[in-house]
Design a protein with these regions (language model features):
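Terminal, low-structured helical/coil segments at or just beyond the last alpha-helical repeat
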Residues: 3-6, 29, 222-223, 227-255
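Short helix-capping/linker turns of helical repeat alpha-solenoids
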Residues: 27, 32, 39-44, 57-60, ...
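Sec-dependent N-terminal signal peptides
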Residues: 5-14
């Protein structure tokens, strides 16, 4: 059973609004930002937007990023991908990694800009080189699929590993898949199971199902139907249909 290869499992709409890190020079700015954050967390989006807009217009990168998220989601303002891109770009040009990642996503999906895989790779790379795990994972996928860059399994694995070592469950699962298939690395089922387990323990449904198959078939681990059933059950609980199917089979005493 292979992972479903969706490009952006950790895409824009999962982006969070980031809180202000206190600095000595801006007590008033800090208070205003925190007021906006409190309003946002209480779903009072219009108030948050009104507080953050003047800050963003003054060049405050985190406020610019937050406005981009609000425009992308239509929170406190009419949904507008063009405005989202505008604010993500302003924050990205100041070096804000999360904004670079989201800008890459917008180019990848053609939201608010003309679809352009090369530009998507450009912005993912900028964020990835700053150590942003989601961008590292997405850059790995772009290399694996040859989108916006020459296909290169070795580069894909390099970026998966960087993200996986930071705890990104998607990257851990994809790294496990690379070891299973011998793509960009020497085939190694034991190493594959190691990474599938890390992702599975974080609730990654596909990884849980694959770990179930590993125990069922003895790939990288000893055959253990009890553990196979356990992981299939977890995968099923998280919506994986393959996990549900094989959990049912093991319950009925089938293979």
């Amino acid at each position: 059973m292979k992972l479903t290869k969706t490009l952006l499992t950790t895409a824009l709409l999962g982006a969070s609004v980031f809180s202000f890190q206190s600095t000595a020079w801006a007590d008033t700015l800090e208070q205003q930002f925190q007021q906006g954050l409190t309003a946002y967390e209480q779903s009072n989006y219009q108030t948050a937007f009104k507080l953050w807009l003047p800050m963003a217009e003054q060049g405050y990168a985190k406020a610019q990023f937050n406005l981009g998220v609000m425009y992308a989601k239509g929170q406190g303002v009419k949904q507008d991908d063009f405005e989202a891109v505008k604010w993500f770009r302003k924050a990205a040009e100041q070096g804000y990694a999360e904004a670079k990642f989201n800008l890459g996503h917008m180019y990848s999906k053609g939201r608010g800009v003309k679809q352009d895989d090369f530009e998507a790779v450009n912005w993912y790379r900028k964020a990835a080189e700053q150590g942003y795990a989601k961008a590292q994972f997405n850059l790995g996928v772009m290399y694996a699929e040859g989108q916006g860059v020459k296909q290169d399994d070795f580069e894909a694995v390099k970026w998966y590993r960087k993200a996986a070592e930071q705890g990104d469950a998607n990257a851990q699962a994809y790294l496990g898949l690379a070891y299973t298939e011998g793509r960009g690395v020497r085939q190694d089922y034991t190493e594959a199971v190691k990474w599938f387990r890390k992702a599975a323990e974080q609730g990654h449904a596909n990884a849980q199902a694959i770990l179930g198959f590993s125990y069922l078939l003895g790939k990288g681990v000893q055959v253990n139907k009890s553990l196979a059933k356990e992981w299939f059950g977890k995968a099923c609980d998280n919506g994986d249909q393959g996990g549900c199917k094989y959990y049912g089979k093991l319950n009925r005493g089938e293979r």
